[in-house]
UniProtKB/Swiss-Prot annotation:
Principal location class: nucleus
Note on domains (UniProt): In the pre-SET domain, Cys residues bind 3 zinc ions that are arranged in a triangular cluster; some of these Cys residues contribute to the binding of two zinc ions within the cluster.
MBD domain boundaries: 595-666
Ranges of residues in domain Pre-SET: 728-801
Protein name, per record: Histone-lysine N-methyltransferase SETDB1-B
Binding residues annotated for Zn(2+) 1, in chain numbering: C730, C732, C736, C742
Length: 1216
């Protein structure tokens, strides 16, 4: 039929079927829907091809990743074996593959010893979108597993050794799925036990006959040998070793070592090992003690203290474990000085005082009993490379060695302080001068593991941390808890009441009132502010209608915004004229405090002065210079011209301290707090001339309730005579610009004659209303008896009160602090320290009852007298023309150890005869061989304090072995130098010339003549010998000293009553004296040109010939007064501590010239940027407060780590 219809259709339609089919296809192709569908299909095809290519790439990546993981595993195994770690392989099934994946990774931060919790995104078990291609799905799953395994491997490798056994994060997928099921990696390290004790779970390796060991020879070096026999000698086993280089020895278990390298699990601080020491091309094996475990700071090396005094870093392949070490490993060290040091080091670990040094610093270093000028070449972990400038010889020294001058000073100062405490001459309070010298400081470091075990980084002393999130519904809780024993050792600073309480001294209408309780779930940051000077900013929720109304009314109110200063654009021209008051007549204000509350450095600009900064390029260096232009067009290029202009125009509303020529101090840089939770416009309630605002950007905790007072308040028993009849006044009419004619300036200048050298400084005092550095002898300002103009006088600064704009703010981890709102120029006056003035006895009682965290010592008299004493006491480290100072006659005062034999005798006896330990060498043919070896390789005097400082013993860290022969030859001279008897004449020999070296030698001779057995006078004129024997009572509060005779029983009772106080007081002296005061005799003998008096009040009048303490002239007073700002004071109480402070303390006499009652003022020691916290150095003396320990977390690069440290003292072989 079709064949029949085709001709009919073709005839009827007039077209053939092929043509019709072709036409239909053309019409379909021309349709938009069909074309769109076709394009989609083409694009889909391209996507499929691209996906196939990606799958191929992923397969290649997976293959490469699998190979990389295998290579990484091999490298990790090699690293583990080199480091002594145990590498174990286990699949996810062995470790519980069905366990939930971990969501938190603990990272041990080596920099600040904090444990940070980092949230880890766990991969989902199932993909959100199912892939259509099975190959693509499998490749994606394999890639996901591989990336997770690589992450686990990186996490395991980066974990430090102290973090214990590391368990990798489990993947979300089922265990063992896919071709890349790589076993997990585990790091097994020493458990977190006591860092100075061995792991009790590890058994000792057995010692068998014919095994290869290392044995100790008579030359103190260790050599390889074979164990030939084990003998029972008494209750101990002896091991007979035949050395490879001929010879036999019968040795004890602590004098033989295994030949293999130990694992990390077997090592700890204090472990006895044999290590290789390299000196050029020579290599020896010596016994030593592990002082540091590997960590990132020492580049994964072990610090070894060798028995002969060396200190060196070695790797694990260079260590060999001692077979049977003693329980107290330091008892195996023959040298007594080194043994004592190691014992003290291990017992006090991980607290290690070390000198903070930087390359290029110049310090004094001891070598062969003489102090030499040396330069820091390189610092490597706990070691420092010192270059002796005289002979260009370099040497590596442990940074905690007393061969370094700062450490020597610290040890001597601690010993002297303990002696004075025992003798009742010094109260147990720290000396906390406000400024330390710029030289190296002693830093207290802690081991990472020990720090981690305490729960993270410690907060700054005296300030418990607060939660970051606001909690107005209840009292905030500390975010970190501390044990009671830890709290009892901390001198905590008060961070305020937990709840809002009425503020003392404030009217009831100014009390901060919480308006509405905040909900913790509220994420919006809306604030409701109370009108008035005091505001409580509280996040609120837009719930009730009444609250909505309040929000709409007060939402736009924030912390007051200060209008910005706009410099005028018009040019200012100068016409020649003589400046007079008419130049400022146009701008002279009707009231002098028109711009009070603004930045004082901006005030001249507000009165139409111009401050312009010019620059010039000289020798490719850009320099800047600030020029002021007066309203009359006169250019003022320096402070002299500015001062002259102010006096010519009689300007009494703009003052000299309001001008600054430092181009880096910006006068219009304002600091604005970031959306605080709590804000107070002025916490002083108008008592200060400048408002002191308060903000809390952390939570809504208010500041502590303290009665504000900008003046000092004498308490009962304190009388300050401020009568003008007892003041010295001047008659200046030139604003006291001429210091030679001003009586008050002359008081300041003449006082500088009390400094070392006795020379008067003609430039002392204020320099254009600024003080660049501390003046230890104090500044005498003009007073009410002077006839000079109070506003124009250049010698009136502190008495004008607060001028800079400051703000009280809540810090993250230091409680409340003070920061500046504007830039502060160097030398500018900031504020004073005010509070109640207490007597010493009353301060002791109140400090024990209420706390001593806000005590400050008015010790100006002691500061100046100690400063004068320090001239001779620190002469041995002065930069004189002599290359060094002989310390062969210096002796540690009041040493608690007796009967110690001479070190050279010990050295000779240890090298010439048989060893005195339990090791004995047989008389075999090895004697001839041993006798040819260097017998001088005996113990040098190292690491430790010593009773006498001979040529061979000065608390040294280590000495070079090449010095042994020289020391041995000088041994007889050292013995002669130490044989000074107590009955000899104590006067120094006559010196023909008083050169730098002769003065030092004279002083050292005086020191050596004061032996441990001193003659003291008793009733009846009979002299008895006093033996210094320290007796420690069972109580932690009392530490006494007994003379060993019945004659001093009464004195012992007095001592117990004095030294039991444990009050920490800040010192208000402006400088930190070098720790050499212990070198000055504290007794009554006043021979030679050395000390000028005792360093504290109780020391005065100790002998008939000694100079009398100045304080004794004030009705026999013996102790200084205390400023207590705990309950009543000014903003100075909030200034925190820093080891790199930006403020220094200066004693200023304003209303009285009584040396006991200076004003305590703070000045800027450097340029301070707006928004920077203001800090000063409390300068606590380590070990000065018994039973107290304060950690420092100031964050400075020069942080010393400790403010107060419990110091251990050796007595009868035990550390207390």
């Amino acid at each position: 039929m079709e064949m029949e219809l085709e001709p009919e259709l073709e005839e009827e339609l007039g077209v053939s079927l092929d043509e019709l089919r072709k036409w239909i296809e053309e019409q379909v192709d021309s349709s938009e829907a069909v074309q769109k569908r076709k394009a989609d299909l083409e694009q889909l095809q391209e996507w499929v091809e691209q996906r196939e290519k990606e799958v191929a790439d992923i397969d290649a990546l997976c293959s490469n990743a699998s190979e990389s993981v295998v290579q990484c595993e091999a490298l990790v195994k090699e690293v583990y074996s080199n480091m002594g770690l145990v590498y174990r392989e286990s699949s996810s099934d062995d470790e519980g593959g069905k366990a939930n994946p971990s969501e938190v990774i603990e990272i041990d931060d080596d920099d600040d010893d904090d444990v940070i919790a980092v949230g880890c995104l766990v991969p989902p078990k199932k993909s959100l979108t199912q892939a259509k291609d099975p190959a693509l799905k499998e490749a994606s799953a394999a890639l996901q597993r591989t990336s997770q395994q690589v992450q686990n491997l990186a996490q395991t490798v980066n974990r430090t050794a102290q973090s214990g056994v590391t368990t990798p994060v489990k993947t979300g997928g089922p265990p063992g799925q896919g071709p890349l099921a790589v076993p997990a990696v585990f790091m097994s390290s020493a458990p977190r036990n006591t860092p100075t004790q061995p792991n009790p779970n590890i058994k000792q390796d057995s010692i068998k006959i014919n095994m290869t060991l290392l044995g100790k020879k008579r030359t103190k070096t260790w050599h390889r040998g074979t164990l030939v026999a084990i003998k029972q000698v008494g209750n101990n086993l002896k091991y007979k070793v035949r050395f490879e280089n001929k010879g036999k020895s019968l040795l004890s278990g602590n004098h033989v070592a295994f030949e293999y390298h130990p694992t990390l699990e077997r090592l700890f601080v204090g472990a006895r090992v044999v290590a290789r020491y390299k000196d050029g091309n020579q290599v020896w094996l010596y016994a030593g003690v592990v002082a540091e475990m590997p960590n990132s700071k020492n580049r994964m090396r072990f610090l070894i203290f060798f028995d002969d005094g060396y200190a060196s870093y070695v790797g694990l392949p260079e260590l060999y474990p001692i077979c049977r070490p003693l329980k107290k490993t330091w008892e195996d060290i023959e040298d007594a000085s080194c043994r004592d040091f190691i014992e003290e080091y291990i017992t006090s670990y991980p607290n290690r005082p070390m000198v903070l040094l930087k390359p290029g610093q110049i310090i004094k270093t001891e070598w062969e009993g003489t102090w030499w000028k040396s330069r820091v070449e390189e610092v490597d972990g706990s070691l420092v490379k010192m270059l002796f400038l005289d002979d260009k010889r370099s040497e590596w020294i442990y940074r905690g060695s007393t061969r370094l001058e700062p450490m020597f000073n610290l040890k001597m100062n601690t010993a002297n302080s303990q002696e004075k405490k025992m003798a009742g001459q010094q109260r147990q309070r720290p000396n906390m001068g406000a400024l330390r010298t710029k030289g190296p400081v002693v830093q207290y470091t802690s081991d990472n593991s020990a720090a981690a075990s305490t729960g993270g980084g410690a907060a700054t002393p005296g300030t418990p941390t607060r939660p970051v999130a606001p909690q107005p519904a209840g009292p905030p809780q500390p975010s970190r808890t501390e044990s009671p024993s830890f709290k009892s050792q901390m001198a905590k600073k008060s961070t305020g009441q937990l709840a809002l309480q009425p503020r003392q001294g404030m009217p009831s209408d100014l009390q901060p009132k919480p308006i509405i309780n905040a909900l913790q779930t509220n994420t919006s940051r809306l604030f409701l502010l109370q009108s008035g000077p005091v505001h409580t900013l509280t996040p609120i929720t837009p719930a009730p209608q009444t609250v909505q109304t309040a929000i709409s009314t007060y939402t736009n109110e924030r912390v007051p915004q200060e209008p910005s200063y706009q410099a005028p654009n018009d040019r200012l021209f100068y016409l020649t004229h003589n400046c007079s008051p008419e130049c400022l007549k146009r701008i002279r204000p009707t009231r002098p405090n028109l711009h009070r509350g603004r930045n004082p450095l901006l005030t001249p600009l507000l009165y139409e002065f111009r401050r312009m900064t010019g620059r010039r390029r000289l020798n490719r260096k850009m320099s800047f210079h600030v020029i002021y232009k007066s309203p009359c067009g006169l250019s003022l290029r320096n402070m002299t011209e500015i001062q002259r202009y102010l006096f010519q125009t009689q300007c009494d509303f703009i003052f000299l301290e309001m001008f600054c020529l430092d181009p880096y101090v910006l006068v219009d840089r304002r600091f604005q707090p970031q959306r605080p939770f709590y804000f107070i416009r002025d916490i002083t309630s108008g008592r200060e001339d400048i408002p002191l605002s308060c903000v809390n950007e952390i939570d809504n905790t208010p500041p502590p309730s303290v009665a504000y007072s900008k003046e000092r308040i004498p308490e009962d028993g304190v009388y300050i005579n401020t009568s003008a009849d007892f003041l010295v006044g001047c008659d200046c009419t030139d604003g006291c610009r001429d210091k030679s004619k001003c009586s008050c300036h002359q008081l300041t200048l003449q006082a500088t004659g009390c400094t070392p050298g006795g020379q008067i400084n003609p430039n002392a005092g204020y320099h254009y209303k600024r003080l660049d550095e501390c003046l230890p002898t104090g500044i005498y300002e003009c007073n009410k008896r002077c006839r000079c103009n109070m506003q124009m006088c250049t010698n009136r600064l502190v008495q004008h009160g607060l001028q800079v704009r400051l703000q009280l703010f809540k810090t993250q981890n230091k409680g409340w602090g003070i920061r500046c709102l504007d830039d502060i120029a160097k030398g500018s006056f900031v504020c004073i320290y005010a509070g109640k003035i207490l007597t010493d006895d009353f301060a002791d009682k109140e400090g024990l009852e209420m706390g001593d965290e806000y005590f400050a010592n008015l010790d100006h008299i002691e500061s100046v007298e100690n400063f004068k004493e320090g001239y001779e006491s620190e002469a041995h480290c002065s930069d004189s023309e002599g290359s060094g100072v002989d310390m062969s006659r210096v002796k540690l005062p009041a040493s608690s150890r007796h009967g110690k034999s001479n070190k050279m005798e010990e050295r000779n006896s240890s090298t010439t005869g048989k060893s005195q330990d339990d090791s004995s060498e047989e008389s075999d043919d090895e004697k001839d061989d041993d006798s040819n070896e260097d017998d001088s390789d005996s113990s040098d005097d190292t690491f430790v304090k010593d009773t006498y400082y001979t040529t061979s013993s000065v608390w040294r860290s280590y000495t070079t072995r090449r010095q042994a022969k020289g020391l041995k030859e000088e041994s007889q001279d050292s013995k002669d130098g130490m044989s000074v008897s107590a009955g000899e004449d104590r006067k120094p020999p006559h010196m023909p010339e008083e050169t730098g070296k002769s003065k030092v030698a004279s002083w050292l001779t005086n020191q050596s003549s004061t032996s441990a057995n001193q003659s003291v006078k008793v009733e009846g004129g009979i002299k008895t010998e006093k033996k210094d024997v320290m007796t420690l009572s069972d109580s932690d509060d009392v530490q006494t000293i007994s003379s060993g005779s019945d004659d001093n029983k009464e004195r012992e009772k007095k001592t117990q009553a004095v030294v039991k106080r444990q009050v920490a007081v800040k010192s208000t002296r402006g400088i930190a004296l070098k720790s050499h005061s212990m070198m000055v005799k504290s007794g009554g003998g006043g021979a030679g040109g050395g000390g000028s008096g005792p360093s504290h009040g109780h020391g005065g009048g100790g002998g008939d010939n000694g100079p009398k303490n100045t304080r004794l002239f004030f009705d026999g007073e013996e102790s200084c007064y205390i400023i207590d700002a705990k309950l009543e004071g000014n903003l100075g109480r909030y200034l925190n501590h820093s080891c790199s402070p930006n403020l220094f303390v200066q004693n200023v006499f304003v209303d009285t010239h009584d040396l006991r009652f200076p004003w305590v003022a703070f000045f800027a020691s450097k340029r301070i940027r707006a928004g920077t916290e203001l800090t000063w150095d409390y300068n606590y003396e380590v070990g000065s407060v018994e039973g107290k320990e304060l950690l420092c977390c100031c964050g400075s690069t020069e942080c010393r780590g400790r403010l107060l440290q419990i110091i251990k003292t050796e007595w009868e072989g035990t550390w207390w």
